[in-house]
């Protein structure tokens, strides 16, 4: 997936109120950008970090700039949680994600489950139905990419919904997109959200599949490249 052009380099001043970030541009101007990430962004929100911003041409937008990338531990990390669904869909359609081939259609944001969630991607075709929930991963400690970076009741709900879909005879997949170049495997962040880790292990034990792929992240493009192991 090509990123919007041009992107604007800057230095992070601070991230606050979850969805706001002050950034100093190359000319010294400080702008307030939209932060499209509701997590804690642990490890990706350090003041002084190099960042890239996109800029909207829509004059009606309150904030023209959107924070897209940050340099974290020597690697570009994609912090925009609105992108992973598109990345996964593109990677399914171009054959990169071999585990999710053979389906004739892909539909986004389909309502499902007893808790009335919206699934990120519903795959339908000859193999049946496959419900795919996508998660963005930017927290890396040592060689392990960890999810979530904050307590996520919504993420817990999604695991329960996927278990229910599997119980009904469909396929359920939790798909982790590691939007940075380090981290050799994905694991639940038990120290941050132990209940999520417990539910993930329970879900996998009950037939939910856990997939993880690394994304190549540059200021020009982001795309999925290789599968990573999920270690529970």
Curated annotation (Swiss-Prot):
Residue ranges crossing the lipid bilayer per the database entry: none
InterPro entries attached to this UniProt entry: cNMP-bd_CS, SfsA, SfsA_C, SfsA_N
Database matches in Pfam families: SfsA, SfsA_N
MF terms in GO: DNA binding
UniProt record similarity statement: Belongs to the SfsA family.
Protein name (Swiss-Prot/TrEMBL): Sugar fermentation stimulation protein homolog
Native organism: Geobacter metallireducens (strain ATCC 53774 / DSM 7210 / GS-15)
Upper taxonomic lineage: Bacteria, Pseudomonadati, Thermodesulfobacteriota, Desulfuromonadia, Geobacterales
């Amino acid at each position: 997936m090509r990123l919007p052009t041009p992107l604007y380099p800057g230095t992070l001043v601070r991230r606050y109120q979850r969805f706001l970030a002050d950034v100093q541009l190359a000319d010294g101007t400080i702008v307030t950008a939209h932060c499209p990430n509701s997590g804690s962004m642990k490890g990706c929100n350090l003041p002084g970090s190099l960042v890239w911003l996109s800029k909207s041409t829509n004059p009606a937008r309150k904030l023209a700039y959107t924070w897209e990338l940050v340099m974290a531990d020597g690697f570009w990390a994609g912090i925009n949680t609105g992108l992973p669904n598109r990345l996964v869909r593109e990677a399914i359609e171009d054959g990169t994600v071999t585990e999710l081939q053979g389906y004739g259609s892909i539909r986004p944001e389909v309502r499902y489950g007893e808790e009335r969630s919206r699934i990120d991607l519903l795959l339908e075709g000859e193999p049946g139905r496959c419900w795919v929930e996508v998660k963005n991963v930017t927290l890396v400690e040592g060689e392990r990419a960890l999810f979530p970076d904050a307590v996520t009741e919504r993420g817990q709900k999604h695991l329960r919904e996927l278990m229910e879909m599997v119980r009904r005879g469909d396929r359920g997949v939790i798909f982790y997109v590691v939007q940075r170049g380090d981290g050799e495997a994905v694991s639940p962040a038990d120290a941050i959200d132990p209940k999520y880790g417990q539910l993930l292990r329970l879900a996998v034990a009950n037939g939910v599949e856990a997939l993880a792929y690394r994304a190549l992240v540059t200021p020009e493009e982001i795309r999925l490249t290789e599968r990573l192991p999920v270690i529970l």
